[in-house]
Amino acid sequence: MQAFHFVMALSPIIVVLVGILGFRQSAKRVAPVALVWTLVLGFTFFNRTGATFTESIAVFDGLIWKGLKEGLKIVWMVFGAFVILNLLRDTGAIEDVKATIACISDDRRVQAVVIGMLLPIFLEGAAGAGAPAAIAAPFLAALGFHPVTAIAMALLGDATPCSWGGAGLTTINGGAALVDAGVSTVSLNSAMVGRIHMFGALIIPFLIVFMAFGRKGFKRIVPYLAFTGVTTCGVMFALSNFVGAEVTSMGTGLISMLLSIGYVKLVGVNTPDEFRNHFTARERKYSAFQALSPYVFILALLPAVRYGFPALVKNGFAVMCTFGYIVWVDVVIMLCGFLGALTMKVGLKQYWSVCKKTAKHVTPVLITMSSLLIVSYIMQSPHTGMMNLIASDTAKAVARLYPAAAVAIGAGGSFITGTGLGSNIMFADMHMQAAQTLGMNPITIFAGQNAGASLGNMICPNNTVAACATVDEIGNENQVMKRTLPAFAVLLVLYMALAMLYTCVLFPNFGA
């Protein structure tokens, strides 16, 4: 009977995965079906509080409205990112973008690593909230990568920094339960998750190249990939262990980008012709700054607003989050697109035309995104207890393998909630209690949870749908997930092994 309850609690996730991957249906068709099924479960099988039908309606009504509002905020960011891509296409600046990036390196594999991994790490620290994939995927598509590949690379590249998120919030707020209980500190939480993610940073450059080009992609580029992996690994370890959670993501991305570009310029990469980014030679329509201006403004304004506004305005961060954290990111991306249009001397009529064309493409995403968010909220709700049932049953089944299970639970939490922060907040208390019962270190177990939650973002349906919308690939979510799942599996197994090793062998008394 217990197993049946577990399967029923898991069934909304099964519906989504089977619908998208098994039946190859678009998320816009699968998401409403999953929502209806989850509502049926919420009214019947998982009515844990014994609420009447009217009381259940009142609970779900609030969750539905919350899903619609949060979905609209995400679609707004998708709209802003897609406007920039369409603006580059419409003006012809996209060719000048390719020519400019080629001045750094015309090797498409180098471009994939820098834009697909290092840029998302920086953007995660500067803003978070889905901005890395929403910005990096269109950028990669603009460079000529297949849109599905571009999305998959951007999601994979953002697999490690989500544990810190914008200004360290995912670790700071997500691990607050351990800090409040006096069993850990923010510094210890950041240090231990950094010791897990450093190995992810080490191998992700190789995974990105394999994802985009297959085995042949490693031809004559292994030294560069090894250098980028080792330096990113080292920088991430140093910042997370000796500086702080607030700057780990942004600092790792920025320093690693500079080191990577420095290697290309000083050492060089012997690029086979098949991996060169060929573009049509023509007279430039825009200067390098003009063509890249929307992205230059994003790189400058996201961290400037995130760190500058709270420093200059009393309760500035609270003001920024008045309508939710993601809204300020939406506004900045929209502003950067508009400033980019002005820099490229695009007329208001043309800019408005691009906006209208983009709106037609992204509006249907609202139904998909809202449906998935509502499913997530219902599963998290105390009214149903579905998410807690999944996590607690998993924990009971694994016993001494709990550190490894914590990684999987963290990934499952972010797969459902769409955020590492949500996953951490949801399960931190449970992990602390389990660690006490099993006589294990709660810091290393929570680090596994935090690292797993970061990984879950790369296969989360919400993030996949949003990223697909930024490059006009709505309906091809199954193709993206087929690309990201193998890389996710590799990293998940690695992190589970590290969680066991750290908890049981290397750091059983860490923080004591």
How would you describe each model-predicted region?
Residues 27, 163-277, 451-512:
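Juxtamembrane and boundary regions of transmembrane helices in multi-pass small-molecule transporters
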Residues 107-138, 142, 366-382, 397-430:
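Hydrophobic alpha-helical transmembrane segments of multi-pass integral membrane proteins
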Residues 72-74, 85-95, 122-134, 160-168, ...:
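Short helix-coil transition sites and intra-membrane helix breaks within transmembrane domains
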Residues 69-74, 101-115, 143-149, 326-329, ...:
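Membrane-interfacial loop-to-helix junctions in multi-pass transporters
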Residues 8-18, 25-50, 75-81, 225, ...:
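Hydrophobic mid-bilayer segments of alpha-helices in multi-pass membrane transport proteins
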Residues 58-95, 114-121, 287-308, 321-385, ...:
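Core transmembrane alpha-helical segments of multi-pass membrane transporters/permeases
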Residues 131-141, 154-155, 168-180, 208-211, ...:
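Re-entrant/interfacial helical elements at transmembrane boundaries that shape
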Residues 109-121, 147-163, 184-205, 400-415, ...:
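Alpha-helical transmembrane segments of multi-pass membrane proteins
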